[in-house]
Amino acid sequence: MREIYIFKDLQDLHKFSAKQIIDQIKIKKDSTLGFATGKTPLKTYQLLVKDHQENKTSWKDITSFNLDEFVDIDPSHPESFIKQMKSNLFDHLDINEQKINIPKSNSSNPDQEALNYENKIRKNNGIDLQFISIGVNGHIAYNEPGTPKDSLTHVSNLTKETILDLIAKNKFSSIDEVPKKAITMGVKTILNQCKKIMMVSFGKEKAQVTKQMLEDKPNENVTASFLQEHPNCIYILDKEAASLLNEETLKKAKWI
């Protein structure tokens, strides 16, 4: 099932994204949820916190897995993904800290940590709902251009484009500060271990890669395009991210 939702109002997009996660918890209180970091999910996370505070949605039985984490960054660093997830979401919920799973950023053996993380996902019987966003070069998680479809959780070398984007977003002040590698779920991991995926993309800067993701044949240059092969992926876009889509794609979309 491939569904495309296009939102005229960005706030409605965030509300819809949050509702997908809240509804999953209501359906299965011990769901396994997959999360992402960066700018895209922030408003959604704020709405999840608001829902927990106002509606008392409980996260105590939830297990979480994050898509990725930098290598060789202190977990207490403000740009480490574990720190971001705690600051933006987990610290404000009743989630059990023992059920929060993110690759260890300070592992002495990142390749082994990647293997361990892959095995942990499998032993958990996968992920019920995974939040994913698309990178400026079309990557999902840190599956950079050229990552094969059969990739499992692995250590990824970040491209220069990704590194410069991190600096442009004021994540790091210089190239020297930016981690050059990340542990990431692989493309095969995402396709095989995630039962449902919600891909969220908004903003003019994402229009070209959103078009490639949805309309190009699945290929390694835009790893997000492999999501076309997932049996249960919904695409949640704003009108700007959808602005370059062709007429055929737009006809299939639901405008909200």
From Swiss-Prot:
State which gene encodes it: nagB
Pathway per its UniProt entry is: Amino-sugar metabolism; N-acetylneuraminate degradation; D-fructose 6-phosphate from N-acetylneuraminate: step 5/5
Question: Which GO biological process entries does UniProt record here?
Answer: carbohydrate metabolic process; glucosamine catabolic process; N-acetylglucosamine catabolic process; N-acetylneuraminate catabolic process
Which segment of the chain is annotated as a signal peptide?
none
PANTHER family listed in its UniProt record: GLUCOSAMINE-6-PHOSPHATE ISOMERASE
**Annotated Gene3D superfamilies:** 3.40.50.1360
Q: Which PROSITE patterns match?
A: GLC_GALNAC_ISOMERASE
The record ties this protein, via CDD domains, to: GlcN6P_deaminase (cd01399)
Q: Give the superkingdom in one word.
A: Bacteria
Name the residues annotated as catalytic in the UniProt entry: D68 (proton acceptor), N137 (for ring-opening step), H139 (proton acceptor), E144 (for ring-opening step)
Q: InterPro entries per the record?
A: Glc/Gal-6P_isomerase, Glucosamine6P_isomerase, Glucosamine6P_isomerase_CS, NagB/RpiA_transferase-like
Q: What is its EC number?
A: 3.5.99.6
From the Swiss-Prot or TrEMBL record, give the protein name.
Answer: Glucosamine-6-phosphate deaminase
- Indicate the enzyme's highest-level EC class: hydrolase
What is stated as this protein's family in its record? Belongs to the glucosamine/galactosamine-6-phosphate isomerase family. NagB subfamily.
Q: Name one GO cellular component term.
A: cytoplasm
